[in-house]
Amino acid sequence: MLQAASALRHAKRILVITGAGLSADSGLPTYRGVGGLYNGETEDGLPIEMALSGPMLRRDPELCWKYIAELGKACLGGEPNVAHYAIAQLQRIKPECWVLTQNVDGYHRAAGSPPERLIEIHGQLSPLFCQSCAAQDPQLSEHLQRPLPPLCRLCGGILRPPVVLFQEMLPERALETLYEQLATGYDAVLSIGTTASFPYIHEPVIRTRVSGGFTAEINPQPTDHSAQMDVFLQCRAAHVMAELISHI
């Protein structure tokens, strides 16, 4: 841990990559899926990749929204944990520290991470927006208590959250921001609670290693990336992040 703290202390530009494991201590499941909520088939007999997809939202919005609502209720029912607050503290200490998250729970924002240095690569749950007229609606929690799918109060169109469902493209602006920052480079990358091998996850790690920077991972179990890291801390982020930041 002291090696990681020393490297982060001396680094100017830092990227913190976070996945579903970070929010496990907030009570959210870590199964694979949008927001890390599902694994395998749904109770409707469909793979979650089909039920919670862009095409399904268009074809059968009521079915798709059934699972969006479960995701929404899980996220709204939790709150940021000590690791989210520690990351926000690191961003206050280091004005060029960025967060790249796969999570859609909004906990980084709630914990105080500055939105201008937060890349939510899978989007976020709110505000909802109308697929017909694009009007925004901030009342996610209220809609989850009503019949689904939620409808636009202006035109009656079907609302949706700005999350990336299965078979949908990543948000263009988030990708642009990520690769703009990657072009500048990072002195250190800290990966927390993610097992994903998507290019936008492992590319920052590889680029930073190649350029001579420092890489570290915090995860309860080793991942495909662990052996390539300078430091691997096998634990939950909530158990170590506050202490790690206290040494910076």
UniProtKB/Swiss-Prot annotation:
Cellular component GO terms held in the UniProt record: cytoplasm
Residue ranges of every copy of the Deacetylase sirtuin-type domain listed in the record: 1-248
Gene Ontology molecular function: histone deacetylase activity, NAD-dependent; metal ion binding; NAD+ binding
Binding residue positions for Zn(2+): C130, C133, C152, C155
Compartments, as annotated in UniProt: Cytoplasm
Annotated InterPro entries: DHS-like_NAD/FAD-binding_dom, NAD-dep_sirtuin_deacylases, Sirtuin, Sirtuin_cat_small_dom_sf, Ssirtuin_cat_dom
Keywords of the record: Cytoplasm, Metal-binding, NAD, Transferase, Zinc
The keyword Acetylation is assigned to this record: no
Residues involved in NAD(+) binding: 19-38, 102-105, 193-195, 219-221, 237
Pfam families: SIR2
Family: Belongs to the sirtuin family. Class III subfamily.
Identification of the protein by name: NAD-dependent protein deacylase 2
